[in-house]
Swiss-Prot record:
The lineage of its organism: Bacteria, Bacillati, Actinomycetota, Actinomycetes, Micrococcales. This is Gamma-glutamyl phosphate reductase. Catalyzes the NADPH-dependent reduction of L-glutamate 5-phosphate into L-glutamate 5-semialdehyde and phosphate. The product spontaneously undergoes cyclization to form 1-pyrroline-5-carboxylate. Gene3D superfamilies: Aldehyde Dehydrogenase, Chain A, domain 1 (3.40.605.10), Aldehyde Dehydrogenase, Chain A, domain 2 (3.40.309.10). GO terms for biological process: L-proline biosynthetic process. It comes from the Bacteria. GO terms for molecular function: glutamate-5-semialdehyde dehydrogenase activity; NADP binding. Keywords: Amino-acid biosynthesis, Cytoplasm, NADP, Oxidoreductase, Proline biosynthesis. Pathway: Amino-acid biosynthesis; L-proline biosynthesis; L-glutamate 5-semialdehyde from L-glutamate: step 2/2. Belongs to the gamma-glutamyl phosphate reductase family. The keyword Glycosyltransferase does not apply. The gene is proA. PROSITE patterns: PROA (PS01223).
């Protein structure tokens, strides 16, 4: 049976000396100081160079990726993970385009968040500054290697990456390409680092590198995220798994219901913003359920339904509590009939990972109740959940979709990779 867990790290990578890992982390800290003092022109030049290097190095990147894909298939990786792992020429070009998009974003550094003049004449301003060193732990997602590095550089941060064994060869080439681009424009190559060659030891040290790494972002399976949150001494921004819901309300338009459900489930089922559970109001079910499920079945979706769903659409297989909690990352879908918007909200509150939920409705009052009651990072009305994405939100790319409430929530772009500090300008004032 295909596995949803990336293959174990390549064992030869475990023999690298621990002091080399420390040098990597310390070099990243040094590079972060240099980046914080760099200009937006310098950082944008670096991003231009990276985009160009990705294009010119596409053949090398795709060749390395082919080796990772072959190893992944031999290891029995699931289709969803293999899809995320894949970098063909088109996807490499898209990565370069994403870097160019990030380069075109406004510089977040030095932005004044708020300010005032005190009665004693002191001038206060709160301004955006880099975190310093951003760590990332992720699996089978080579696009994340480029996205996070580019966002970190744009926001003046160094980055230390742990991309997992499944993409080991691809990530090594991507990091080498980006480091070469940095050197060509006069920035420190150490601003982009990887600890992949250290295997699990690298991940463990990265999680405990408080003082050298300022913030850690995990992206991947629920198990990976739980492990990082539980074991890290570095502050973590949690990017949760995507048990994503679409709710078809009593007044849902039938055509819109089909279009949104199909897009949310089928367009790319292996990503975190894909719909995993469909909730249907009992009054809407006779109008919309069969049409929606027929359209999904015709596109290869297996429906896991409750008794009410199976009574109206016998092709469904029985759903259990495991289905309501499942992030399938495949062409599987859990479907339940509910009695009201309140029942839908209650189901979401119990089973959601607080990523993205959407309601399809023609009733503005019901839409507002749903928006107010659902506690997720992104809540939508009459739109596919697939729009929860940094590029779709205009961020160029994303570090991840934060499902926590502290610091950042939702798609994380360049501003979410900054902190703030207070600048106080005086003319000799003393408190006395």
């Amino acid at each position: 049976m295909p596995s949803n867990v990336p293959a174990a790290p390549i064992t030869t990578a475990e023999v690298l000396p621990a002091d080399e890992l420390e040098r990597i982390l310390e070099a990243a800290r040094t590079a972060s100081t240099s980046l914080a003092a760099s200009t937006s022109v310098q950082r944008d030049a670096a991003l231009d160079a990276i985009a160009a290097a990705l294009v010119s190095g596409a053949d090398r990147i795709v060749a390395a990726n082919a080796e990772d894909l072959a190893a992944g298939r031999d290891a029995g990786l699931a289709a969803g993970l293999l899809d995320r792992l894949t970098l063909d020429a088109r996807r490499v070009a898209s990565l370069a385009d994403a870097v160019t998009g990030i380069r075109g974003l406004d510089d977040p550094l030095g932005l004044v968040v708020r300010g005032r003049t005190l009665p004693n004449g002191l001038l206060l301003s709160q301004v955006r500054v880099p975190f310093g060193v951003v760590g990332a732990i992720y699996e089978a997602r080579p696009n994340v290697t480029v996205d996070i590095a580019a966002l970190a550089l744009k926001s003046g941060n160094a980055v230390v990456l742990r991309g997992g064994s499944a993409a080991l060869r691809t990530n090594a080439v991507l990091v080498d390409v980006m480091r070469g681009a940095l050197e060509r424009v006069g920035l420190l190559a150490h601003a982009v680092q990887t600890v992949d060659a250290h295997g699990r030891a690298g991940a463990a040290r990265l999680m405990r590198a408080r003082g050298l790494v300022d913030v850690l972002v995990p992206r991947g399976s629920a198990e990976l995220i739980r492990t990082v949150v539980a074991e890290s001494t570095v502050p973590v921004i949690e990017t949760g798994a995507g048990v994503v819901h679409v709710y078809l309300d009593a007044s849902a338009d039938a055509r819109m219901s089909v279009d949104i459900a199909v897009d949310a489930k089928v367009s790319r089922p292996s990503v975190c913003n894909a719909m995993e559970t469909l909730l249907v109001h009992r009054d809407a079910a006779p109008r919309v359920l069969v049409a929606v499920l027929d359209a999904l079945r015709d596109r290869g979706v297996t429906v896991h339904g409750d008794a009410a769903v199976r009574a109206m659409w016998p092709d469904a297989v029985p759903a259990t509590d495991e289905d309501w909690a499942a992030e399938y990352l495949s062409l599987d879908l859990a479907v339940r009939v509910v009695d009201s918007v309140e029942d839908a909200v209650a189901h979401i509150a119990r089973w959601s990972t607080h990523h993205t939920e959407s309601i399809v409705t023609s009733d503005l009052a019901v839409a507002e109740r749903f928006l107010a009651a659902v506690d997720s990072a992104v809540v939508m009305v009459n739109a596919s959940t697939r729009f929860t994405d940094g590029s779709e939100f205009g961020f160029g790319a994303e570090v991840g979709i934060s499902t926590q409430k502290l610091h950042a929530r939702g798609p994380m772009g360049v501003q979410e990779l900054t902190s703030t500090k207070w600048i106080v300008r005086g003319s000799g004032q003393v408190r006395g």
